[in-house]
Amino acid sequence: MVTTKRYDYVPIDQVQEHPLIANHRELNESKVAHYQRDILKNGLLEPLVVWERKQREYFLVGGFHRLNAIKRIRAEHPGYYDRVDVRVVTGELEEIRALNL
């Protein structure tokens, strides 16, 4: 069963994509641009959802477009979003893969 383990504030470089749980759709450039503007204006209002496999090893489960927006913000504004809010979930790999966030 997938459960929320905790909410945390982690270094963005520790959030990675895992090939077996990449359940996102194709990257939508207009959606990423929208998130860039929104995050710069209002901050990250909804945390990324990550699966913690080992201590400080986080794999993205939900928030693919937001993560890409943050990466682009960081490229344009060094020092922004070195850390991000995340919801850390636990569960077996098959349960995590079944999520469609």
Predicted regions span which residues?
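Short, charged/polar connector segments at secondary-structure boundaries
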Residues: M1-R87
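Alpha-helix initiation and N-capping motif
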Residues: V32, E94-E95
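Short, charged/polar surface micro-motifs in flexible loops or helix N-caps
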Residues: R66-L67, E92-E94
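Short, Lys/Arg-enriched N-terminal segment that forms or immediately precedes the first helix
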Residues: I96-L101
